[in-house]
Amino acid sequence: MSLTDSELWDLAERMDIPLTFVGFKDELNNKKLKYNKSYIINMENEFDEDGQRNTGSHYTCFQVNKYPNGKKAGLYFDSFGMPPPQIVEDFVGEKLPYCEKDIQSLMNSACGWYCLAFLHFINVYPQRTKNLYWDTEAFLSLF
């Protein structure tokens, strides 16, 4: 069962995920990056070529952390193991590492659930290391 944007917001709040954005990828153009905040994006643009509003296709997510020592670490997560679209890298201002592991079947519509699980793991899970890359490896090892 797929999730709507409002359901993602609601669940993220209940899960204590520091979510700051849920929307179509082209809506990032009007935003400014916030460090240590989670972004869930729909891989379609808000409007199709005919000017009709899209209903959405597939959720992915990313986060860029800034640590007290000034070091930054970002990561893009797609449950299909695909790289980030150019619009995300332009928004972040640099090339983002991404998870290459495919954990979702093409016949499955649970991408929003996978995004929430990933973001909860890296932000809230009590046994996390608070190192974005190590925690991502630990999350992916569950699949």
Annotate each predicted stretch with a short phrase.
Residues 1-50, 91:
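Conserved active-site-adjacent core of cysteine acyl-enzyme catalytic domains
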Residues 1-21, 105-122, 133-139:
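Cysteine-nucleophile protease catalytic domains, especially the papain-like/related folds used
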Residues 34, 38, 75-76, 132:
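Intrinsically disordered, low-complexity N-terminal regions enriched in serine/proline/glycine
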Residues 40-124:
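Cysteine protease-like catalytic core of ubiquitin/ubiquitin-like
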Residues 126-129:
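Phosphate-handling active-site elements
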Residues 141-143:
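Short Fe-S-cluster ligation motifs
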